[in-house]
Design a protein with these regions (language model features):
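Generic low-complexity, intrinsically disordered sequence content enriched
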Residues: 12-13, 217
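Positively charged n-region of N-terminal signal peptides that target proteins for export
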Residues: 1-4
Length: 298
């Protein structure tokens, strides 16, 4: 009898341990809620009301916000991105879009965010994107990467069209990151670049991997004093004669009414992912949250 009771006790104890293990496994396998970052659960929540264009390049060239549509890809392919797949550039690749919505055309302030993975190049400047202008060689807005002599730095040049009268040509009003302000350690790995222009304060900011770059006043307030307006600020953006949009090339790659590209005008050869345009200048917290969320594939 004692032996029988002992066997029962052992059997009961074994069953209890097994059930306890099952409970433990179930608890371990239950989804763990994401911790909010900067008050957001995912990247699309950041300044959601101000996101006017978004390209994730998950096997498509479409803008999920439909701010820029009618895309035609030339030699477009994809590779692994920071989040899903990414646009893979080459010496002959670009994407041309035929339709640009008023939400993009009429931007007064702007933030452009993108992830890029690229290598050093020579021979000219690679265009990341461009908002063309029919009668202006430089277009309305663009970002490009100049060739450089260092494998750890990037010479980024941004051009933004200003609110001007027809008699004044502000072509060539570049923000240039070179010399002491060159962007360092940019090649060979994924980097998030975010730049913004605040039309209210006429100030420019740039961030790399969620961190704001400290810029001299000559750059951050590049547009704070307009000599043609008695030293007043340049003010809000004023894109005009907008026709089409291009990723990975220049407006000159689109044909008429633009001429053929100059020899230094190079297609972007790196990877690009999560390209976004906002109609406001994002705050430091918003940029930091966007970086962390996208890096976390959220």
């Amino acid at each position: 009898m004692k032996k029988y009771i002992s066997i029962l006790l052992v059997s009961f104890a074994t069953s209890a341990v097994f059930v306890s293990c099952e409970d433990s496994i179930d608890k371990e396998n239950k989804p763990i809620p994401y911790e909010p970052i900067g008050g957001y659960e995912n990247s699309d929540e950041v300044a959601a009301a101000h996101l006017v264009s978004k390209f994730s390049f998950d096997g498509t060239i479409d803008d999920s916000k439909n701010g820029i549509t009618g895309g035609t890809g030339t030699n477009v392919s994809y590779d692994a991105g920071i989040k899903g797949s990414a646009y893979k550039g080459s010496t002959s690749s670009f994407i041309a879009y035929d339709n640009v919505a008023s939400s993009v055309v009429n931007l007064k302030s702007i933030t452009v965010s993108m992830w890029i993975k690229t290598d050093q190049h020579t021979g000219g400047a690679q265009s990341l994107f461009m908002l063309p202008k029919k009668t202006d060689f430089w277009g309305n807005i663009f970002s490009l990467i100049e060739s450089g002599s260092s494998n750890t730095s990037m010479f980024l040049k941004n051009h933004i069209q200003r609110d001007v009268t027809p008699s004044i040509d502000w072509s060539g009003q570049f923000v240039e990151h070179n010399g002491d302000n060159i962007l360092k350690n940019m090649y060979g790995s994924w980097k998030q670049i975010v730049w913004s222009y605040n039309g209210t304060s006429s100030t420019y900011s740039i961030y790399v991997d969620g961190q704001k770059i400290v810029l001299p006043v000559s750059i951050s307030k590049r547009y704070a004093s307009d000599p043609t307006k008695g030293g007043g600020p340049f003010g809000e953006l004023a894109s005009s004669e907008v026709s089409k949009f291009i990723i990975g090339g220049y407006q000159q790659h689109l044909g008429a009414p633009w001429g053929a590209p100059d020899g230094w005008m190079l297609n972007y050869t790196g990877l690009m992912d999560e390209f976004r345009i906002y109609d406001v200048a994002l705050t430091d917290n918003e940029v930091s949250a966007l970086y962390k969320l996208e890096k976390d594939k959220r």
